[in-house]
Amino acid sequence: MVHEYKLIEVEEAHSLRDRIDILDDAYYVDRSVISLNQGLNGEIGSYYSIHDGSLPKDIRNELYEIAPKKDLPLTEVVINRYRIGDWIPPHEDDVGPAYCSTLHLEDSEEGLSYEGGLSKNKAGWCKEFPMNFVHWVEPVSDPRYSVIFLYGRGI
């Protein structure tokens, strides 16, 4: 159910991560307060994100350039930032975008959990899954970032 493939080289992923890591906290939205991502049982997770309209132009342009090419238009790019203890509850994103591809910027024994498995993070690799797919992020033990490419929002 999760399709994985290499999108960019590890060095490029790490370089992008390093540039994102120095962004001021003011760029981020606290997703436990704004644009809540509620779980299947109403839980509220804890993590931060930046939507593409708030990103510095050079980073935004780079993300749009490296985005996987799909049959639906790329309509939004979001960066999720996870600090130690941050998490996202089990949920399905069945509204808004029709399709999602997630790029990881570092290697981790942690990753995307879903019914039936765990897909570990690999720097430079993408995970793709349908939006009605139940998935979550367990409380993280190491800080990390994910770039979320959303396709077909509003179609």
Language-model features: where?
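Catalytic core of non-heme Fe(II) oxygenases with the double-stranded beta-helix
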Residues: 68-155
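Non-heme Fe(II)/2-oxoglutarate
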Residues: 1-70
